[in-house]
Amino acid sequence: MASAPLPGPPASAGGDGPNLNNNNNNNNHSVRKCGYLRKQKHGHKRFFVLRGPGTGGDEASAAGGSPPQPPRLEYYESEKKWRSKAGAPKRVIALDCCLNINKRADAKHKYLIALYTKDEYFAVAAENEQEQEGWYRALTDLVSEGRSGEGGSGTTGGSCSASLPGVLGGSAGAAGCDDNYGLVTPATAVYREVWQVNLKPKGLGQSKNLTGVYRLCLSARTIGFVKLNCEQPSVTLQLMNIRRCGHSDSFFFIEVGRSAVTGPGELWMQADDSVVAQNIHETILEAMKALKELFEFRPRSKSQSSGSSATHPISVPGARRHHHLVNLPPSQTGLVRRSRTDSLAATPPAAKCTSCRVRTASEGDGGAAGGAGTAGGRPMSVAGSPLSPGPVRAPLSRSHTLSAGCGGRPSKVTLAPAGGALQHSRSMSMPVAHSPPAATSPGSLSSSSGHGSGSYPLPPGSHPHLPHPLHHPQGQRPSSGSASASGSPSDPGFMSLDEYGSSPGDLRAFSSHRSNTPESIAETPPARDGSGGELYGYMSMDRPLSHCGRPYRRVSGDGAQDLDRGLRKRTYSLTTPARQRQVPQPSSASLDEYTLMRATFSGSSGRLCPSFPASSPKVAYNPYPEDYGDIEIGSHKSSSSNLGADDGYMPMTPGAALRSGGPNSCKSDDYMPMSPTSVSAPKQILQPRLAAALPPSGAAVPAPPSGVGRTFPVNGGGYKASSPAESSPEDSGYMRMWCGSKLSMENPDPKLLPNGDYLNMSPSEAGTAGTPPDFSAALRGGSEGLKGIPGHCYSSLPRSYKAPCSCSGDNDQYVLMSSPVGRILEEERLEPQATPGAGTFGAAGGSHTQPHHSAVPSSMRPSAIGGRPEGFLGQRCRAVRPTRLSLEGLQTLPSMQEYPLPTEPKSPGEYINIDFGEAGTRLSPPAPPLLASAASSSSLLSASSPASSLGSGTPGTSSDSRQRSPLSDYMNLDFSSPKSPKPSTRSGDTVGSMDGLLSPEASSPYPPLPPRPSTSPSSLQQPLPPAPGDLYRLPPASAATSQGPTAGSSMSSEPGDNGDYTEMAFGVAATPPQPIVAPPKPEGARVASPTSGLKRLSLMDQVSGVEAFLQVSQPPDPHRGAKVIRADPQGGRRRHSSETFSSTTTVTPVSPSFAHNSKRHNSASVENVSLRKSSEGSSTLGGGDEPPTSPGQAQPLVAVPPVPQARPWNPGQPGALIGCPGGSSSPMRRETSVGFQNGLNYIAIDVRGEQGSLAQSQPQPGDKNSWSRTRSLGGLLGTVGGSGASGVCGGPGTGALPSASTYASIDFLSHHLKEATVVKE
């Protein structure tokens, strides 16, 4: 950097000495310096003359005078011509038109002096460093002298400074208005450094049309690109937005991030040569490093640290960290105290400031409502921020700007808003000239912050001994936000700590130190006691035990309403408050930028909640409605919150719930999930109703129409779900974010407990009942159910997150890490009913009147037995950290069916979910509801069903006719001890009858419907529930197609593809895992994997029902192919899809039939799959003469086998489920299996056909249940339930491919391990 200018005008002879003579033409008295210098381009020597301000010459004066001339640099061809009055100078450069004067060096010249004017770049080369320094000082001093002299007058005649930005002109440069803090840069410079570059049409240069010759202007915090002959920068980039920069040869590039006004991208520019490019690079890196060090020394935050003597300021996290710094006073930092961003893009010249500016709206919207003095009716102070309303609110002009002088002249700083470029005394070297004495008024502070923002006027009438704010001695209405009574500019980015902290002299006891102007809405966080002296300038953040601790004093009227305002700026809410205060001035300096967060300390629960009913100030004038965020971390439960002291602590750990010992303060789940799901416009629920609006007990809650903001009868309306899923056209796309429970303004009942402190930030669409109510009291009715019930904040969370409960053997620990397309259920568990006839919840007609399936998390569902929600006080009231990772968009609103899903599966790659939990019904579906009716098996999912959490396995209405993406490559490792389902005696269902789980009806994002009475007569004739030994008998194919919901939906819906789901259950199962039936695949769906059925590898120690897995079958065919299943030897590492199956020769293929089609082998578990039919019965695969060579080549065949003889499992005979029932296959035990020791490398499944498979019916083209069945391995697994092909893995008969045929159950039992054959490579 150049050295600072010398104080005072330099000697008339400097550098190489004056070449003065008595020639009147030379106007000797105005010549400051002259001598030979070289021009940069060609190196020609020219004679340069530096003239100070004055007339054009004596001759001109004698002729009648001429307008005074600005300081200028002239050059002549030679000294002789200058002395001999040979003619006019070859060139005249007005110095006040210079953007900057810099020392430079390039490849040719080491000692350059560069002058950057509005329209050109001019550089001269000195012979040595001393000569360069002499000219540089002379130039800068002359410019500084001219500016200081022009402070109170207009520009001189020849001056172009009125049109220049920044200190040099009437308007502040958009990028350089903050340079003159202290004496770091010469006072002559609008910018610290200026380079002339040629922006190339590459990256942002092309997309933003930034090409051509620009001036790259570096200021303390920004770099601006000023086009030639332009006054304002075309683009201003914050240094903090620069991700990286570099140079190569003569090119220099900058990569900026998303927060830049241009958006993310790169800017490429070409300098004169590589030396200049390197200089640009190094200089910008140095500036970025300095800024980084400044921020490290002074932490970035939207809020202020409290206390003027704080050496370790408390940094409150801000919503958008790129907005501002914490501005410590110069007395503490010794560094520049400026807002983090310095300029506006395309702000009108009249609005420009001379010292700095705060970033108003986001950086790109400066010209509109951003912060132009003309745009919002708010003149800009010299600090670049809106002025506080006062008698001297005039738009800045050049005379205002320069009236106080610049450089180190703080004595000229006045009380006018246009106090000067250094009005805020930006460094320690500047005395605090404008700081008012502490005795200005009883409400002012003696601040060491250096800008004297000490006044804290109180509301009128609150404290009679204090003067009214409007009668402040200095006549200016100050605000505690920024504008102080001393007349310092109200700079929102410029607030000192004493404005927000509790300095020893702070009058914080009055809790309402603010004027009635919008600027002062940034309310100060109160110290907990009157003096705050013992806090030593810190804001109290401790956790009081009770209100006896140190609650701050409540004030009534305006002050009480002010307490609930967070320390913030730019507050905007999408709703209108119940009552509004009239804002005296439509200016909002304190609303300008910050979204401040305040931790307040009143309330009962140990969580932070927003303040009073009117929880955020609603001002009539919101100048920036597009960028307001209302983040309040307060704890006021109601205007009369007398429920005990809140500790002021906000739990920030994910999943960790804060507890408190209160009887009514079971803090359940202080967890806020922020998982991205389907996105739509936000909608917030403003007035949640009380329990008085609840329907009577047992009544169903009808689902409101999708897409509208719901109002739920939640407990006190404490949860505010600003879910962006609920869109409405009037939303402007912004939502208020509450980190606390806000009571309804109409319901200030202090007895109501606010529920969960966390907002549902997930853009997931709510269920059919909208965003769920916080309690299941809606199901039980009456307000008595709300008493003593904790606020389960997860009720507003996506279905993935819920508290575990083990009531009625129903544990909800099943977590899904799949990529569901449909809505993730909360693992709908259907509690055992007192009467089997009670069957399912809601009406039996399948209407969407289930109150809790869609809206209430499972842990809060009311149990018909207990009569109270499960999982409440009896359960662990803690937040369950989500172990379910959604890879695709969750769909929880019926409105999601407005957006068609792609039929092409988005394979997320092989996700493996390892669930260690005591799953009550993980592996076995809950018996009573599932066995309730035939329709229940096709319309309801159990929590144990892996498909119950899968998008395409989600049951719903049959109106959803879209295809679901296959949940490919999903492996579920379930270490659980499932409990056996209670067998039911109702007819019409079998335990294994889960044919409807993956039916088309199951692909809907709706909650499970109550089982509907089957409308088909054949469903009334289904066999009775089997004996325990018959648990694995699968339903007949006709039952799968004739049941009520399935029959009505399978023809009109294209089912999802739940391919490649492998559930490996390691646990002690009371009963065998229930088979899950894959749905038929649509004809046009591209099968992403040969394993379309749900393969469950159940490695369990069966304690009962072991023989149920065994099936009468023929001895194994030695020529039969095997299904090779590979477990990942690396222990469940999620492999990239590119490395999943690089080739099909990694194992010895049992049959080469699929080897040519390796592109479909993207399952996580199936490496090379080949199934060959049993030769028994001479049935062919899929009914053809030849088996298909690959899943993709299998022809869809339709078969409706007759209803008869679903063969029961015979527990007395060795099973052939896997293929070695007492035959030639050698028994294999898990303990001795090399495959188990090596991580279950390969499992050979021998799927055998059955005799009599020729008895299958012929295909019927209309049956979609068998569409594309043979296109995947699930379809090749055969049909189950017909007379010829019953069994879990029965070989397919002649075209008989019902939905029950695609389940391959591979069970490694503690005994009877003959069923498994582990194949080593």
Curated annotation (Swiss-Prot):
Family matches, as Pfam families: IRS, PH
Chain positions covered by the region annotation Disordered: 1-32, 51-73, 299-536, 834-871, 888-1091, 1110-1198, 1251-1275
Polar residues biased stretches: 1039-1055, 1163-1179, 1253-1271
Residues modified to Phosphoserine: 303, 343, 362, 381, 385, 388, 520, 556, 573, 590, 604, 616, 675, 678, 727-728, 762, 796, 819, 907, 965, 1089, 1098, 1151, 1163, 1165, 1175, 1190
Biased composition (Low complexity): 18-28, 435-456, 478-490, 930-959, 1139-1154
Function comment: Signaling adapter protein that participates in the signal transduction from two prominent receptor tyrosine kinases, insulin receptor/INSR and insulin-like growth factor I receptor/IGF1R. Plays therefore an important role in development, growth, glucose homeostasis as well as lipid metabolism. Upon phosphorylation by the insulin receptor, functions as a signaling scaffold that propagates insulin action through binding to SH2 domain-containing proteins including the p85 regulatory subunit of PI3K, NCK1, NCK2, GRB2 or SHP2.
Gene Ontology annotations of biological process type: brain development; cell migration; cell population proliferation; cellular response to glucose stimulus; cellular response to insulin stimulus; cellular response to peptide; epithelial cell migration; insulin receptor signaling pathway
Residue span, IRS-type PTB domain: 191-295
Modified residues (Phosphothreonine): 347, 517, 524, 575-576, 771, 1071, 1148
Protein name as it appears in the record: Insulin receptor substrate 2
Record PTM Omega-N-methylarginine, positions in chain: 409
Quaternary structure (record): Interacts with PHIP. Interacts with SH2B1; this interaction enhances leptin-induced activation of the PI3-kinase pathway. Interacts with GRB2. Interacts with PIK3R1. Interacts with DVL2; this interaction promotes the Wnt/beta-catenin signaling pathway.
Bias type Pro residues, positions: 1-10, 1005-1014, 1072-1082
Short sequence motif YXXM motif 6: positions: 814-817
Ranges of Gly residues composition bias in the record: 364-376
Main localisation: cytoplasm
Motif (YXXM motif 5): 734-737
Keyword hit for Nucleotide-binding: no
Crosslinked positions (Glycyl lysine isopeptide (Lys-Gly) (interchain with G-Cter in ubiquitin)): 1314
Record's GO cellular component terms: cytosol; plasma membrane
UniProt motif YXXM motif 1: location: 536-539
Localization per Swiss-Prot or TrEMBL: Cytoplasm, Cytosol
Keywords: Cytoplasm, Isopeptide bond, Methylation, Phosphoprotein, Transducer, Ubl conjugation
Source superkingdom: Eukaryota
UniProt organism field: Mus musculus
Database matches in InterPro entries: IRS (IPR039011), IRS_PTB (IPR002404), PH-like_dom_sf (IPR011993), PH_domain (IPR001849)
